[in-house]
Amino acid sequence: MAAWEFALGLLTASLWRWARKWRSPVKVKPMLAAVSSLEPQLEQITTDLRDRDRLLEDLPVSFLLLDADNLVLEANRSARVLLALPPEDYCRPLLEVVRSYELDRLVARCRAANAPQTDRWTLTPVNPDPLQVVPQTPRPVQGQAIPLSNGQIGVLIEDRQELVDLAQQRNRWVSDVAHELKTPLTSIRLLAEALRDRLQDEPQVWVDRLLGETQRLGQLVQDLLELSRLEQGPSGLQKLEAVDLVALLTSVRNSLEPLAEPLRLGWAYQGPEQGFVRGDRQRLFRLWLNLVDNAIRHSPSGGCLYVELRQRGDTWICDLYDDGPGFADADLPYLFERFYRGDPSRVRPAAASSSSPGSGLGLAIARQVVEAHQGRISARNHPVTGGAWLRVQLPQEPSLTPALKIGTGRRSG
């Protein structure tokens, strides 16, 4: 900031010396007046820059400024704390200052796309004192890289540890409540079954309704406990083995056939005869059971469920879509959240009046199963049918080579 003031004074002094030395007929006073008129503007620029520096320094989010060669030019207070940076001038390569390959890749993507890029990862800061062997605590972060002028990149890094801690506390609380509810619900169900055996006619109808609600609550408790286990990540999985996705989808279809048959729903599969992933067979079955069951509940009578399986590199991609009404745009960001129920107009009247509506946990469980298997799941509306479209991506089982005979894609009722 003082550089502007210094340059202005230097320019003024130079003009006076030049005029005195050469006794130039050029009128120096108008030139000096023009230079002096810049002073208020330069002072305002200086003030704005100081405010900008103060704002960046006190931001609760970590900020880094990189030049065109990925040298770190600036780091605010939050960045120095989060990244364990020494209080010194930087002007060193990013990977030397912040040893995070995820951050380096984020910046590279930003430069390649010339557009803001966002990513999440677990950051492990490097201890600035090489004599201290105490490891730094890994922290979940979210980073955003923003392209600026002259090849510079602005990087914002948010520490998500508090959010993760709150989510873990919530999950522990839900798990504890579910455990506490499991035993009394079992007792109520057993008592209701014993009471039903002793009653006849109209009172038995009320007991049957009581049993139905008890079973629904019991399933809700089981789903909550399942979610808590799956949120542990891969450690929440049980036996890992080679699982054939095609055989798994066939089993799911057979299990849900009694639900689809009254609606005369077709099933159109296109893909190889086998496709192996490494995973927990029981959890993967639950994944597809939830997705196909959800599709059946929202499909019109006489409609069709479409399943397409293909391989891309070392990943299996499975698309499941229908020709129903599709997702509401307002629902798309929240479909995989716990207890979220979408637009009721999507549900068929018969399904909407069912005595055993969904718990709102089916898609949340599906997402956790996919993420526990290091995969990805996404939802949108299909561009051709207009129906709901769910895409699941899972890593291929590396030890098995799938058959590549492609199905005909024919419909079967």
Curated annotation (Swiss-Prot):
Residues annotated with Phosphohistidine modification: H179
Biological role stated in the UniProt entry: Member of the two-component regulatory system SphR/SphS. Sensory kinase. Is involved in inducible production of alkaline phosphatase in response to phosphate limitation as it is directly involved in the regulation of phoA transcription in response to phosphate limitation. SphS functions as a protein kinase that phosphorylates SphR.
Locations listed in the record: Cytoplasm
EC category name: transferase
Coiled-coil zones: none
Name of this protein: Sensor protein SphS
Catalytic activity: ATP + protein L-histidine = ADP + protein N-phospho-L-histidine
UniProt lineage: Bacteria, Bacillati, Cyanobacteriota, Cyanophyceae, Synechococcales
